[in-house]
Amino acid sequence: MSNIITFDPSSPFPHRDCFFPLKGIYLNAGVQHPVSRGSAEAAYDYIKYKGFHTDHDYNPIVMRKEVIGKFAKLINAEPNELTYVGSTTAGENLIIQALELIKNGGQVVTDDLHYFGSYQIYGELKKQGIEVITIRHKNGNIDYAEYEAAITDKTTLVAVSSVSTFNGHQHDLKRLCDIAHKHGALVYADSIHHIGATPFDVKDSGVDFISCGTFKWLMADQGLGFLYVRSDVLPKLNRPWYGKRQVRNLVTHVFPGDQIANDDQVYEYDLEESTEGYFSVWSEPRIVIAQLNYSLSYILETGVERITEYRQPMLKILRTEIEALGLKCQTPPDSITPLLTFACNNANKRLAPLLDKAGIKLSIYRDHFRLALSVYNDMDDAKRLIDSLKQLD
């Protein structure tokens, strides 16, 4: 095995040397975070192992457990409360199926700052008879009095993004969970824009479920995510599907050497009472797990609190200077998350050519744009964006 590229996480920011040279100014980690040099090398080591052509001490089964342990440490969860899923949205769908909402009925309360890819989930549930209440944001923020009014004893699930992909709004999950739990409702949080970027503690929040993909602030690739289910919630759920990872104590009556007493009993088994025992069925993309083995160590050793603190001066100057240009910020003023969103009429037509020329990459939509700051950005990046926006007609 090759030596994984080492980088001292305690070194001063920006951590540009941790990554490959970036083309221009990259302010788009909210879409896809760059993979670090060490993460790429970890993936390459896994590929070499898959060649089975050299001596190695690679153990992907051990690595799988180690990565679950690292993610558990990152969010203050127990490892048995976690499993792998295919994506954030896959995890959200599994929770809905495990609650058997369509079969049992119920009410879902959500808001319009939830991930737009989840709109159709609740739209389709509504078509099938589930009452769905969607709270509208006001100036990029959520009024919890509206959640207080909407959540009742009829409510089964509250579904939100703990940090909104639209504008970086961060929910007060503890407050929301207190409101929901008072009525017996459970809370799901899409946390793909939260974990790894801003401190997150599942125990402190009281959240029942989270799902988090790995290609944004966890600094790996697509095709994998983590699902968290609070251990005391499991008895309220039904397994949405079945597979070998859910099984323990499997005894077969099929193969040579097995005891075959009768034709009816082909196998015996017990089911694991854990998040994996409810939701895991398949082999995951191990190459992404290999990346995570490096990137999660980097995040843990660097410290999410330190990452959060580093970007605050950049966020402040960007908000102040860009708003001074007449572009209204859509992100709540007290936000500490890495995302800033600004309204901009005809942004696709007016802004895209300007930023392309300046070599600046961020997310541009019809009438707004969003930037995302990470550990490799610095104040010069912020100032170059501001200078470019001053040329906007």
Predicted regions and their residues:
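Pyridoxal 5′-phosphate
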Residues: 1-393
